A protein has these predicted regions:
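General marker for long, soluble alpha-helical cores
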Residues: 26-121
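Secretory N-termini
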Residues: 10, 23-26
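Sec-dependent signal peptide recognition
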Residues: 8-15
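Hydrophobic h-region of N-terminal signal peptides that target proteins for export
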Residues: 16-24
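Short, Lys/Arg-enriched N-terminal segments with co-localized hydrophobic residues
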Residues: 1-6
């Protein structure tokens, strides 16, 4: 019974850690979405530079993501942030986008395994 109590405490601790990590990722994604309008207000060249610097990617990769994300810079920004917060490779996020974009970003997030709701205008 003593071993059972220890196992139960370890399970509760692990659950707490998982929930905490998930909440941090959701907060980061929510912050990005909140900044989306601010990003959209800048010139395209500045936006591209910000994405390259913030996500440490080259212009060539950025152009590839643009083509793979429906030729929409807003989608590229969201996909980059989702990749960063979910720990997925951007290639995977683009594949999910290609498969589920008709159903919106919420469906893409569900398929990736992120429970954050995205309200995109």
């Amino acid at each position: 019974t003593n071993g059972f109590k220890i196992m139960k405490r370890i399970q509760v601790l692990l659950l707490f850690i998982v929930i905490s990590c998930s909440m941090f990722a959701q907060d980061r994604l929510s912050l990005f979405i909140g900044r989306a309008n601010k990003y959209a207000a800048v010139e395209l060249s500045d936006y591209r530079k910000r994405l390259c610097v913030e996500y440490n990617i080259s212009n060539q990769l950025l152009d590839d993501y643009y083509r793979r994300c429906g030729s929409n810079w807003g989608n590229v920004g969201l996909a980059l942030e989702i990749a960063k917060t979910s720990g997925r490779h951007m290639r995977e996020v683009c594949d999910y986008y290609k498969r589920y974009h008709r159903n919106g970003w919420n469906r893409i997030l569900v398929e990736i395994g992120n429970k954050t709701r995205v309200d995109v205008l």
